[in-house]
Swiss-Prot record:
Binding site for substrate: 126, 171-175, 264-269, 335-336
NCBIfam families: pyrD_sub2
Alphabetical GO biological process terms: 'de novo' pyrimidine nucleobase biosynthetic process; 'de novo' UMP biosynthetic process; pyrimidine ribonucleotide biosynthetic process
PROSITE patterns according to UniProt: DHODEHASE_1, DHODEHASE_2
Family: Belongs to the dihydroorotate dehydrogenase family. Type 2 subfamily.
Cellular component, GO annotation: mitochondrial inner membrane; mitochondrion
CC cofactor note: Binds 1 FMN per subunit.
Reactions catalysed: (S)-dihydroorotate + a quinone = orotate + a quinol
Entry protein name: Dihydroorotate dehydrogenase (quinone), mitochondrial
SUPFAM superfamilies linked to this entry: FMN-linked oxidoreductases
Phosphoserine PTM sites in chain numbering: 168
Entry EC number(s): 1.3.5.2
Entry-linked PANTHER family: DIHYDROOROTATE DEHYDROGENASE (QUINONE), MITOCHONDRIAL, DIHYDROOROTATE DEHYDROGENASE (QUINONE), MITOCHONDRIAL-RELATED
């Protein structure tokens, strides 16, 4: 409908221009055509350029999905195209979802009202470069990171591989991060700019103590700085860092600037990291994390834990016990998988070391989510993540017990329209129901 109305407007405008053109061009010679009609041609050119620019500023434009994405996939490496996308979003030249979210998509959790249940998982905006640009794609929740205390380059390149027949990727980035200080500086600069525009009387207070001005009640918006949209900060550890202190330092550094904190103990690309999912180690870590979180200025951000999809039922039962004991606010299921399902069609890159994401991950992550939901206290929400690229996928996660969902790989294949597409497909599947009505309601 959007494309039809847009091109109908173009056609009508050109028709009117054509009438004027015909009335003034009769008898003119080819030699002085442009001189005689430069004003008319300028109007037509400006009009056409304006329409094209407006069209490209909307995530629904066919240009993004039908032209840009295939070109990127054909002529660039995955990591290069990822970097270009982040740069474009950071410069504010990426499109926006211009359709208001239907109220039936809203979900309230941790005392926060999300305008829709679709988030963008950590790993896309690792260095907090493009918070506003990515949220403008139509997501209600963005996780930056994973962020490590000290800068580290991650694993050597190449470390990101497309499995095109499976619409999947394998990555072994290895927590490449510019470190706490650099990322905190970016976030504080963004908040200061917002305060200067909306509440300049707070600038002196902010400059003296930035953390004192980040209460959403003071800002008037969440810490994402966008109404009904939220900023998560995903915390990791350095390759040779301290298993407890790295996360505690992350809570201390970012707790007053995040709507949500996520403890990532599940990346397969940092040696030994997944050992932190074991009952004793996880309990020790989360006890320290929650204690540090409780020292922050109020309101305290909820603490979530991101776990792997490769855990067995005994391990998931242990994790459920720890989450309840440590009073953790939520859990994300899950990260990438080290498994290589037999359903994979790709022949190249399949044996690369790293975590697999995309549609082949979905049945693995869904099974993990269902198993955890059986053992997890009902008051601890789950965010589902893994292979989600359609409204049907999202609804399958919701019925399995996910309060919200996240996408990652689908953004790289479908482009900026993905959040809009999933939301519209959810609405079609809901058939008048609300998202919250189907959570945990298996058919």
């Amino acid at each position: 409908m959007y494309q039809r109305s847009l091109f109908r407007g173009v056609a009508q405008g050109l028709k009117r221009s054509s009438v004027r053109f015909q009335s003034t061009s009769s008898g003119s010679s080819n030699g002085n055509f442009f001189l005689r009609h430069w004003k008319l041609l300028s109007v037509i050119g400006s009009f056409t350029a304006g329409v094209a620019i407006y069209d490209m500023s909307d995530v629904r434009s066919f240009i993004h999905g039908r032209i840009e994405m295939p070109l990127f996939h054909a002529f660039t490496t995955p990591e290069f195209s990822h970097r270009v996308a982040i740069l474009a979003a950071s410069w504010g030249i990426t499109p926006k979802d211009r359709v208001a979210d239907d109220p039936s998509l809203a979900v309230e959790v941790w005392g926060k009202k999300f305008c829709n249940p679709i988030g963008l998982a950590a790993g896309f905006d690792k260095q907090a470069d493009a918070i506003s640009g990515l949220l403008n794609f139509g997501f209600s929740y963005l996780e930056i990171g994973s962020v490590t205390p000290k800068p580290q380059p991650g694993n050597p390149k190449p470390r990101y591989f497309r499995l095109k027949p499976d619409l999947s990727v394998i990555n072994r980035y290895g927590f490449n991060s510019i470190g706490h200080d650099a990322i905190l500086a970016k976030i504080q600069k963004r908040v200061r700019k917002y305060i200067a525009k909306t509440s300049p009387q707070l600038l002196k207070q902010f400059d003296a103590n930035p953390a004192s001005c980040t209460d959403p009640a003071v800002l008037g918006v969440p810490r994402s700085l966008i109404p009904n949209k939220f900023l998560g900060i995903n915390l990791g550890k350095n390759k040779n860092g301290n298993e407890i202190e790295d996360y505690v330092e992350g809570v201390r550094t970012f707790g007053n600037f995040a709507d949500i904190l996520v403890i990532n103990v599940s990346s397969p690309n940092t040696p030994g990291l997944r050992n932190l999912q074991k009952k004793s180690a996880l309990s020790t870590l989360l006890t320290a994390v929650v204690s540090e979180r409780n020292k922050l200025n109020s309101p305290h951000p909820p603490v979530l834990v991101k776990i792997a999809p490769d855990l067995n039922e005994e391990e998931l039962t242990d994790i459920a016990d720890v989450l309840k004991k440590c009073k953790i606010d939520g859990v994300i299921v899950g990260n990438t998988t080290v498994q290589r399902p037999k359903t994979l069609k790709s022949t190249s890159h399949v044996e690369e070391t790293g975590g697999l994401s995309g549609p082949p991950l979905k049945p693995i992550a869904l099974n993990t989510l269902r198993t955890l939901r059986k053992h997890l206290s009902s008051d601890i929400p789950i965010i589902g993540c893994g292979g989600i690229s359609s409204g049907k996928d999202a609804i399958e996660y919701a019925r399995a017990g996910a309060t919200m969902v996240q996408v990652y790989t689908a953004l790289g294949y479908d482009g900026p329209v993905i959040a809009h597409k999933i939301k519209q497909e959810i609405l079609a599947e809901l058939k008048g129901k609300r998202w919250v009505d189907i959570i945990g309601k298996e058919e």
